[in-house]
Amino acid sequence: MRILFMGTPDIAAECLKALYSAGHDICAVYTRRDKPVGRKQVLTAPPVKEVALEHGTPVFQPRTLRDGSEDANIRALAPELIVVVAYGCILPKSVLELPKYGCINLHVSLLPKYRGSAPVQWSVLNGDAETGVSIMQMDEGLDTGDVLRCEKLAIGPEETSGELFDRVTAVGARVLCEVVPAIAAGTLTPQPQDHANATLAPMLNKEMAEFRLTESVAHIHNWVRGMNPWPCAWFVTSGGKKVKVVECRAVASQGEAPGTVLATKPLTVACADGGIQLLQVVPEGKKPMDGTSFAAGLRLKAGDVL
């Protein structure tokens, strides 16, 4: 099948690799523009662009598709199907209607749950036991199209968003490669989403990553897992210092007041209904360290307030 691929980050690059490996004809790739990265602001190509160029595939990087400026080019490419994975640009109706088989999108949640930019992170932040991937037939809405195929994945009790993202990427690439030939064969039955049960997964930011020791063990534990690797959960100590928490474990307590140090090896602190072991932290202005070293640096002892 002649496919036009649209995508930008690592998950899209892995899906594109899988489509190449499956022998599909990728007529062209659309991706976001190169952007400055890092402290030195080095102009860097999106992962999808790098994969496409390795395979000699034409790459297009328009600012937008919504103004119709790319319609003629896409029509000339004559794709039978457009595959979209985390592209970052909205497809107008004029593009959605161009290919014979329309446009499909890989979304890393069990739609209609977690429509939006950060479905993997919100599934962990909310303490869900499972998530999944969905392949949908795109329409003009935000992740509202009929679902062609979905597959569930269990979420581990200590799994971070980063770890889960690696797994859904692999599953998503596989499922996508199974769906494409099924579309050509006409063996799929699109299932309309239950819009009444839709939930949203908005983009994360650094301010959202804050938690308080007065909150529940479950909330803090989920927040630390869900904000890993970015933007990284953090709290403010009684002394006004910001501390990022990379890894933690939930433990029982004896009802001590939130913020009370329960132990220092490893550093364990009381919260609303239990205790949290702070296993890996990044104190404000310092390098990452384990919680025990952090406690030693502050000369904390059991009974102190962090």
At which residue positions do the language-model features occur?
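N-terminal Rossmann-like dinucleotide-binding module
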Residues: 1-39
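Donor/substrate-binding cores of folate-linked one-carbon enzymes
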Residues: 21-22, 32, 81-200
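Active-site-lining helix/loop region of Rossmann-like oxidoreductase modules
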Residues: 178-237
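A structural microfeature
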Residues: 28, 61, 148-149
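N-terminal glycine-/serine-/threonine-rich beta1-alpha1-beta2 phosphate-ribose binding loop
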Residues: 36-78
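A residue-level signal for conserved active-site and pocket-lining positions in enzyme catalytic cores
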Residues: 7, 29, 52, 82, ...
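An anion-binding loop in the catalytic cleft
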Residues: 213-306
